[in-house]
Amino acid sequence: MKKLGLVCRIRKAKRTKESKNVAVTFQNIASRDYDGIYNDIYATDVTYIPSPIDVDQNFVYMSAVIHHKTKKILGFNLSLYNDNSLVIDNIKKVNFPKNFVIHSDHGSQYSSKEYLQLIERLNGKVSMSRIGNSLDNREIEYFFSVLKTEMFENFEKSVKKMTLKELERHLNKFIDWYNNERMLKKFNYKTPHELWVEFCKK
């Protein structure tokens, strides 16, 4: 890579403390079926984003939902609070099919009564990663990694210079690009949206 003058951007992981509820467990239905071969799987998680210039706290929080089979991001929510509403408001934005699996880690929001009742009303099945196995939720984790390495040259510095509204606008723009323009080599260079259209026709 050096001979070609190429530089590979590697984002350093930052440790953040997240509330987990290990007392509530659900079967890992997804079972690393990353391409949704056996079930119609949707994955969700929350990521920490450095606070914009007009927010007086260390982080803001983003919840997102990805479709395993097509890799399309179907909804996201940005909030000042990492609470149940962050996740539940996002789930309500997604038009799920009649039968689906929603996979997550053991974040406290995903074991809350409100969340579990919502998934039941939507006729979905809850799936949870094994404790301490981040790879079980690889698809959404990978998307967050792409977001933080490809959205800006320096994600943290860029975010800290903008307002919360500007951040939300940039996130909308990035996700639109990710879904509609970012081609996936694994799937013959189709975009997530193209794969989603094919999936919906079946």
Predicted regions and their residues:
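Generic structural signal for secondary-structure transition and capping sites
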Residues: 6, 35-39, 96-99, 124, ...
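Active-site beta-loop-alpha junctions of metal-dependent nucleic acid enzymes
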Residues: 58, 76-97, 101, 111
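Basic, flexible linker segments flanking DNA-binding modules
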Residues: 1-38, 191-201
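C-terminal domain-tail junction helix/linker
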Residues: 113, 120-122, 146-202
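An active-site-proximal beta-strand-loop segment
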Residues: 35-74, 80-81
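RNase H-like two-metal-ion nuclease catalytic core shared by retroviral integrases
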Residues: 17-21, 104-106, 112-116, 126-150, ...
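Mobile genetic element proteins and their domesticated derivatives, centered on retroelements
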Residues: 1, 30, 45, 71, ...
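Short small-residue beta-strand/loop micro-motif enriched in glycine and branched aliphatics
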Residues: 70-76, 127-129, 153-155
